[in-house]
Amino acid sequence: MFEARLLRSSILKKVLEAIKDLLTQATFDCDDNGIQLQAMDNSHVSLVSLTLRADGFDKYRCDRNISMGMNLGSMSKILIFAGDKDTATIKAQDNADNVTFVFESPNQEKVSDYEMKLMNLDLEHLGIPETEYSCTIRMPSSEFARICRDLSQFGESMVISCTKEGVKFSATGDIGSANVKLAQTASIDKEEEAVVIEMEEPVTLTFACQYLNYFTKATSLSPQVQLSMSADVPLVVEYRIPDIGHIRYYLAPKIEEEDS
């Protein structure tokens, strides 16, 4: 038997919002430690890694390891029926071919349940190597979302450059160019508004704006985002979900074509 209960269904809704533009289907791997999802996006350009720890749920029971393949479009249709303040419970029997979502209103006057067929997804598990990053940037997630949205109006690619002076985001296209520079905040009362840069050596890499904008769909999950960069390895964009886990996106840098 598998059962996981969240006091607020809004977390589940936000997690789905953060991945459904990249994935049409995914396997949720459940064990004693919690729920994990790891998958390449539909175009095999980026990788999504989600961890929801068992201790972050109001109730969590997993008698034996279970992998649940789900169509995220179908799951999205079901989650629409949950009020943001409803509790959400996910249940499945061992070796079941369906999963049940139960939503309860705060006063328990309304209880609704929805059953969804599970899918057999033969997806390979990708090992993510441990990497030491040359540059780590922590900044407000809403600011990062705004920069990605604004600069994508100028070009399809965005250059992220990290130096001891700060971090610079730039894009160039037919209408011109745009640059946004952020310096490390000297002191700030609210931690979530801080810009913190840890740098071993300067890094400048180019990424597809389209995917960065997909990643910022996770903005509502966390007030801060962390960007980790090193030359020639994928960028990691991490949103920590308070009290329960994190979602990480990996995106390989674009290789700049030499002018012929």
UniProtKB/Swiss-Prot annotation:
Quaternary structure note: Homotrimer. Forms a complex with activator 1 heteropentamer in the presence of ATP.
DNA-binding region(s) in UniProt: 61-80
Pfam families attached to this UniProt entry: PCNA_C, PCNA_N
Gene3D superfamilies named among the record's database cross-references: 3.70.10.10
Keyword terms of this UniProt record: DNA replication, DNA-binding, Nucleus
Protein family: Belongs to the PCNA family.
Gene Ontology molecular function, alphabetical: DNA binding; DNA polymerase processivity factor activity
PANTHER family registered for this protein in UniProt: PROLIFERATING CELL NUCLEAR ANTIGEN
The protein's name: Proliferating cell nuclear antigen
Cross-referenced CDD domains: PCNA
Location within or outside the cell: Nucleus
DNA-binding found in the keyword field: yes
Entry's Gene Ontology cellular component terms: PCNA complex
